[in-house]
């Protein structure tokens, strides 16, 4: 068990990160004025969610027993350039629109830039005030159809974006992370990312996966 080994090794701090997706049932009190925060109970609706939730429980057990300091980070969909370029978030959409293909899009995405995630890690490491706390890392929410149109506009594509709007999703709070000092740049960072992926795609290419369309 990794946590037990960390205790034996006298590790001073553990930072546990997991996807912020598995809350299961959402309380009816959650709305735009009262977004889902870190205190919301977790009732996983899948085995995967149950496992992730149980790991958080183990982490808190070791923290409460004073084995080590603990901080938990829960990012939503993280976007950023990956070493394997075509695995970068939204690469396929950018690539297809860059070659003026039409794309069909549906659904929606809660997003956070990898820069913000790294910043959060830096803010909690060695920070005693963050010990025992959980932080949601979310910058915003965008419909994939709107994202496609933003991509087309940013790279001057002649390709058209078709499809249906996704659901608005559950409002989530990032107040705790902001109070920690994490910055969330919003859609302007997405535009910068789109331009960077477009530039890198032109220089290095990437593997197209037509089955996804």
Label every model-predicted segment:
Residues 22-23, 78-80, 142:
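Conserved sequence/active-site signature of Rossmann-fold short-chain dehydrogenase/reductase
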């Amino acid at each position: 068990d990794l946590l037990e080994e960390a205790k034996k090794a006298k590790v001073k701090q553990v930072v546990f990160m997991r996807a912020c997706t598995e809350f299961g049932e959402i309380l009816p009190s959650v709305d735009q004025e009262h977004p889902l925060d870190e205190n919301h109970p977790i009732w996983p609706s899948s085995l995967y969610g149950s496992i992730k939730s149980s790991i958080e429980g183990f982490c808190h057990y070791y923290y409460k027993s004073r084995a080590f300091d603990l901080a938990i980070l829960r990012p939503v969909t993280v976007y950023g350039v990956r070493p394997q370029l075509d695995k970068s978030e939204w690469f396929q959409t950018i690539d297809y629109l860059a070659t003026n293909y039409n794309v069909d899009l549906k659904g929606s995405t809660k997003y956070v830039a990898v820069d913000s995630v790294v910043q959060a890690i830096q803010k909690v490491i060695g920070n005693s005030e963050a010990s025992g706390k959980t932080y949601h890392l979310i910058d915003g929410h965008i419909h994939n159809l709107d994202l496609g149109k933003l991509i087309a506009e940013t790279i001057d594509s002649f390709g058209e974006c078709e499809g249906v709007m996704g659901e608005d999703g559950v409002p989530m709070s990032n107040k705790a992370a902001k109070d920690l000092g994490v910055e969330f740049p919003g859609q302007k960072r997405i535009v910068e990312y789109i331009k960077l992926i477009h530039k890198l795609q032109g220089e290095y290419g990437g593997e197209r996966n037509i089955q996804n369309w």
